[in-house]
Amino acid sequence: MDPDKEDKTLELMCSLPRSVWLGCSSVAESLCALRCLQSLPSSRAHNQNMTGMESQINTDEVSPKKTTVFKLGNGSLAGSRKRPSQGSFDKEKDLCIQLFDQWSESDQVEFVEHLIARMCHYQHGHINSYLKPMLQRDFITALPARGLDHIAENILSFLDARSLCSAELVCREWQRVISDGMLWKKLIERMVRTDPLWKGLSERHQWEKYLFKNRTNEVPPNSYYHSLYPKIIQDIETIEANWRCGRHNLQRIQCRSENSKGVYCLQYDDDKIISGLRDNSIKIWDKQSLECLKVLTGHTGSVLCLQYDERVIVTGSSDSTVRVWDVSSGEVLNTLIHHNEAVLHLRFCNGLMVTCSKDRSIAVWDMASATDISLRRVLVGHRAAVNVVDFDDKYIVSASGDRTIKVWSTSTCEFVRTLNGHKRGIACLQYRDRLVVSGSSDNTIRLWDIECGACLRVLEGHEELVRCIRFDNKRIVSGAYDGKIKVWDLQAALDPRAPASTLCLRTLVEHSGRVFRLQFDEFQIISSSHDDTILIWDFLNVSSNGQSDGRSPSRTYTYVSR
C-alpha cells in the first residue's frame, strides 16, 4: 500500500467510532468498510456527522433508502457503493470473465486469492458452500473409467460386511465394482484365513471348495457369496447360543476291556481320536464311524500322557518310559529311558520336547527326528511330583503337587519365578501368550499373568480335584473328579469387574466317573474318564430334541477287547 494512502487510512480509522471498525471480524472487512466510508462526502463533513452516524449504527435504525449503508457479515454496518444497473453489471461481468480466461492458471489463482481477501466472512461462507461439493470426488467411479478397476476393488476390499452392504447401495457403479471384484468372496476368504471358527465351518459345510480359486469358471457368481455370508453368521450365532445354553448332541465310545479301568489321555483331529488307557494300550479311533482302527501295545504300565503330529505319536507311561511311535504303521521308533518313576505329562513342538515325572524332575530334550532325541537339560526344583508341563519359545511352565507353578527360560533352562496361590497340589495347567490357567486339588481354577506372577482370578465351582483344563480365546473348559465338565467365560474372567456368579456358562454332566482329560475346539468337546468312556459333545450338529440341561440323547459305540 502507498505510504500516503496508508497514513490517510489510519487517520480515517482513528476518526471513526469504535463501534464501526472494531465490529469487523477480519482485516479484510475493516478495509472494505474503510473504502466504503472513503466514498462518502468530504472527510470534514463526514466527521461533523459522525456522532449521528454512530447513533444510527448502535440503534440499527438506518434507513433502507440510503445506498451508502450496508450490513457486514458480522452484523455491523458500513457504507457501500450503489450497485450498477443490471445491464451495466452484466457487461462488466462478461468483460472480467473474458480477461480471466486469458490469464495463466497461476495468475487466475492469484487473482481469486485477492478477491477472497477483500470479501467478508458472510461471503466466505457462500463461497465455501459452493466449493465443497466441487472438491468431493467419487474415486470409486472415477478409477474404473481410467482403467483402474483393480485399485477400486482393493480399496473396497478393506470394508467389513456391514460397510460392504452399504457400499452396494451407493450407486450402480459401486455395485458393479463389488460384484465384478468378487468382494464378498474375498471377505469370506479373509475370515476363513484369520478365524478358526470360520475355517472349521468351511470344512464341515464343504463350501471351502468354492474359495481361494481365481478362475471365474470354477466359482459361483458374487451373489452366491453375498447370500452365503449371512448364513455363516447365523451358524456362528447358533453355535455360540448352543455353548451358552448347553445344547449339544452326544456320542459315546465305550472302551471297556478286561483290564481297563479308565482312559487317561487323548488327542483328536478331524479324522481320528488317539487315546491312552490304563490297560497299557493306545487305541486309535475313526472320528466319523467311532470304530477302533488300531491298538498299539508295548508299554508295561498305564499310558498316562500322549501327543501326536502328522508323523509320530509320543507317549508317557507309569512304566517310567517315553515311547515314540510311527503314526501310519504303529511301530515303535524310539524308547527313552530317563525318569525313575511314572512319566506324568509331556509336550513337544519345533524340535523340543519336555517331559515331567513323579520323580519331581523335568527333562528337556532336543528332538531332531523320531530316532534322534537327546537329553539337553534336567530341571530340578519342585518338592513333589511334577504333574504337568507346557512351553513356548520363551518359557517352560511346570506345576506340581507341592502347590507351586514354576517358570523356566526355554532357551537357557534357567529358573525364572514361582507362582504361589493354590492351597493344595496342582494337577493341570495350560500356558499361552501371557496367560497361565491352572487347576488344583483345592477344587479351584486360577488365572495367572506369567510375566509378573500375579493371580488374575480364582474360579470356584467344582466339588473335587480339577484334573484337566483347556482354554482358547473365548472360554475355559475344565474337567474334575466330580465327573463334571464346566464351561467358563474367559473374557469375563479376565475382567475384574465381572461378578463371580456370571463366569460359569454351563455345567455338563454325563460322565459317571472322574474326568481325566479333555480337548475342545469351536464346535465340540471330547473328554475321557475313569468310567472307560470317551464322550464327544457336539455343539454344531444339534438335533431338534437336543436338551439344554447338560444332558442329551447319545449314541453309543462299544469296543470289545479280543
UniProtKB/Swiss-Prot annotation:
First and last residues of every WD repeat: 256-295, 296-335, 336-375, 379-418, 419-458, 459-491, 508-538
Pathway: Protein modification; protein ubiquitination
Primary subcellular site in the record, as a coarse category: cytoplasm
Alphabetized InterPro entries for the sequence: Beta-TrCP_D, F-box-like_dom_sf, F-box_dom, G-protein_beta_WD-40_rep, WD-F-box_domain-protein, WD40/YVTN_repeat-like_dom_sf, WD40_repeat_CS, WD40_repeat_dom_sf
GO cellular component terms listed in the entry, alphabetical order: cytoplasm; nucleus; small-subunit processome
Keyword match Cytoplasm: yes
Keywords carried by this UniProt record: Cytoplasm, Nucleus, Repeat, Ubl conjugation pathway, WD repeat, Wnt signaling pathway
Domain F-box: 149-187
Any Gene Ontology biological process: sprouting angiogenesis
Subunit structure: Self-associates. Component of the SCF(FBXW11) complex.
Domains as described in the record: The N-terminal D domain mediates homodimerization.
Name under which the protein is recorded: F-box and WD repeat domain-containing 11-A
Organism of provenance: Danio rerio (Zebrafish)
Encoding gene per record: fbxw11a
